[in-house]
Amino acid sequence: MYQGEELGLPEVLDIPVEFLVDPQGIQSGDPAKGRDGCRVPLPWSEEAPVYGFGPRGSTASWLPAPAAWGERSVAAESGDPGSMLELYRSALALRRQQPELGAETDDTALVWLPAPAGVLAFRRGNGFVCTVNTGSEPATVPVPGTLLLASAEVSVAPGGATLPADSAAWWRI
């Protein structure tokens, strides 16, 4: 996990040149060539312009954050069951609760499973299956067990489970 992924934050590719601090970006004059875009401070609150990063009353942080980051702040996503932050919290809690998801051993080795085009499926040990729809359309997969966690709403029917586009589901088998 890299800074901001737990909030669903993208890399900022349009930092104004006058705010660049990374030597690669400064020398090239191109924000996309430096590392500043992935170093923009995390938004802790919904309060612009610094979104809780810095002392109370701050008017600027060391790199400017996009205006839309307030709605993706820790404060905005905390407690929202549909947020990326709560998905990560749930996934980490699941991993702590299920020893099989910890360090790989001979009993918990990852095994790739057959899956439809655009879908990755793997088993971890004898207890878990993960299905990931990398496509831009919903995909139907066999139901391998009990749904534990999903990144989007999964519809389960007798013919299989439908994974929305760009989603993942974790199953107990």
Question: Which residues are covered by each model-predicted region?
Answer:
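Loop/helix patches that line or flank the sugar-binding groove of alpha-linked glycan CAZymes
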Residues: 1-128, 137
